[in-house]
Amino acid sequence: MVNAEKRQIAKRLVERFLACEITNDEFNDTFPRDKADPALEAIYSNLWSYYDEQHTHKLDGRHTLQPETRGLFERCAAFLASGLEYEWPSYNWISPKYGLMRLFGLSRKINDEFERFKTSGSFEVWPFIREADYRRALASR
């Protein structure tokens, strides 16, 4: 279920983080969560891996995002503004179990699980599931 109010807050946070207006800590501490809207959790947990949690910073200097990663953040903002339901299957981007599985030599299982996840839609436009949805969202901005 789309939580429009929380998505608007999340969208603005993603945009402000990209514009170097807020720090990683501000982004992390104020990003809204809602178990009834799986897009919020999926976007939060995916973006979490692209910034340093060890110290406070903005996305500039050595923390400047690569173009591909910047595109991911921009797609997330566009998705949050789209009003679309999140259609991807559940996937925990930051699960501690993956670290343990790698430690015990189960990397292939993790990779296979992720590859199955990616085939659920057009992964190049995640969090959109279809390229057409992404194009429509861009056209309406």
Task: Tell me what each language-model feature is.
Residues 1-141:
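Acidic, Ser/Pro/Thr-rich low-complexity regulatory regions
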